[in-house]
């Protein structure tokens, strides 16, 4: 593998000194870029794009050609694991992801296999190794998975949900069935992320998109407990370097201390959290990633620059901050505004790293 030329993202996650604050964007390979839309059209549909290693590599690299980003993230989807378990993932126009079959009974959950990442999910591993090779050491590659709780919401509901009625009914009336599902998912995620690391991912992130829908005690029992199991099971060193792990619960500002106790290296913050407060609470234990409101990219460029300065000042001096949005970039954002955001982070952060 080529030697890494820009490692400031990995260094910041491990709280080692950096020259400027590193920056990348969730969904940086996405529909806001015309070149992405062209490649997706060429692929035919979203999952065909994910399953073609060359095209997945192409869209991963597209934002790096435009912007001075400090990391690349694997182009894939969080629902690859449930799809590989045989639930039949498909996408409805305007409806988002759906499954042909649900995992909404104890019998259905018991029947679920744990997928082999090199077999049923081999297309993801081919994408990881292709991207890592084509990056030529320019920046590190981030691998990722959904959290067990978040994956389970789609599997029990049969797709996206606003109220989570079916899974919450299971959680409160059949908790053992849900724990069995979450345990299988945690085992699957460990295998999946370790395979990504073996194929070239230099850092991994767990997206707990729907953890914020849980009550205080339910979050610990049904989400955090299983992310803890994953952190404990991950390969933490590869290519002679530590492989940092980031946990991100959207709406998880209440639980930063508990998340920091898992042994992860960094916490993702959404835009509802004050980063200065987050650093006071957990900055001695973990690095922080975030946390500009993605909608700020609709603002005039001077306003974006002002917001970047405010977040940098909120975090303050020293390392341990990876700048990002508080969630994925929106599809209608002007690519020039994204570029101005990335440039502002590098230019305005230098004074905090003397």
Curated annotation (Swiss-Prot):
Keywords: Cytoplasm, Decarboxylase, Lyase, Porphyrin biosynthesis. Substrate binds at residues 27-31, 77, 154, 209, 327. It holds the Pfam family URO-D. It catalyses: uroporphyrinogen III + 4 H(+) = coproporphyrinogen III + 4 CO2. GO terms for molecular function: uroporphyrinogen decarboxylase activity. It is found in: Cytoplasm. The record marks 77 as: Transition state stabilizer. It is an enzyme of class 4 (lyase). SUPFAM superfamilies: UROD/MetE-like. Pathway: Porphyrin-containing compound metabolism; protoporphyrin-IX biosynthesis; coproporphyrinogen-III from 5-aminolevulinate: step 4/4. GO terms for cellular component: cytosol. Its main location: cytoplasm. It comes from the Bacteria. Its EC number is 4.1.1.37. One of its GO terms (biological process) is protoporphyrinogen IX biosynthetic process from glutamate. Belongs to the uroporphyrinogen decarboxylase family. Catalyzes the decarboxylation of four acetate groups of uroporphyrinogen-III to yield coproporphyrinogen-III. Homodimer. This is Uroporphyrinogen decarboxylase. It comes from Shewanella amazonensis (strain ATCC BAA-1098 / SB2B).
């Amino acid at each position: 593998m080529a030697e890494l030329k820009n490692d400031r993202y990995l260094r910041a996650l491990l709280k080692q000194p950096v020259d400027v604050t590193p920056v990348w964007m969730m969904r940086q390979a996405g529909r806001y870029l015309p070149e992405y839309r062209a490649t997706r059209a060429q692929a035919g549909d979203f999952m065909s794009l994910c399953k073609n290693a060359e095209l997945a590599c192409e869209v991963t690299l597209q934002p790096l050609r435009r912007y001075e980003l400090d990391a690349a993230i694997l182009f894939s989807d969080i629902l690859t694991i449930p799809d590989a378990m045989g639930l039949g993932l498909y996408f409805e126009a305007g409806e988002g992801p759906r499954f042909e079959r649900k995992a909404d009974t104890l019998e259905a959950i018991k029947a679920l296999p744990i997928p082999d990442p090199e077999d049923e999910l081999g297309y993801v591993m081919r994408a990881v190794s292709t991207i890592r090779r084509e990056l030529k050491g320019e920046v590190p590659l981030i691998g990722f998975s959904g959290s067990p709780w978040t994956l389970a919401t789609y599997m029990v509901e049969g797709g996206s949900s606003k109220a989570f009625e079916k899974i919450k009914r299971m959680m409160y009336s059949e908790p053992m069935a849900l724990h069995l599902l979450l345990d299988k998912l945690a085992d699957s995620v460990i295998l999946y992320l370790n395979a990504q690391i073996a194929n070239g991912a230099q850092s991994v992130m767990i997206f707990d998109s729907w953890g914020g829908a849980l009550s205080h005690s339910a979050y610990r029992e049904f989400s955090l407990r299983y992310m803890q199991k994953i952190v404990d099971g991950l390969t933490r060193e590869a290519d002679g370097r530590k492989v940092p792990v980031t946990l991100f619960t959207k709406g998880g500002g209440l639980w930063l201390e508990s998340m920091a106790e898992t042994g992860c290296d960094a916490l993702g913050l959404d835009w509802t959290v004050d980063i200065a407060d987050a650093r006071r609470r957990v900055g001695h234990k973990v690095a922080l990633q975030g946390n500009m409101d993605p909608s700020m990219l609709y603002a005039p460029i001077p306003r974006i620059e002002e917001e970047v300065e405010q977040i940098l000042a909120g975090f303050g001096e020293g390392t341990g901050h990876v700048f990002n949005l508080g969630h994925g970039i929106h599809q209608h954002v002007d690519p020039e505004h994204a570029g101005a955001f990335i440039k502002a982070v590098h230019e305005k952060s230098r004074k905090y790293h003397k």
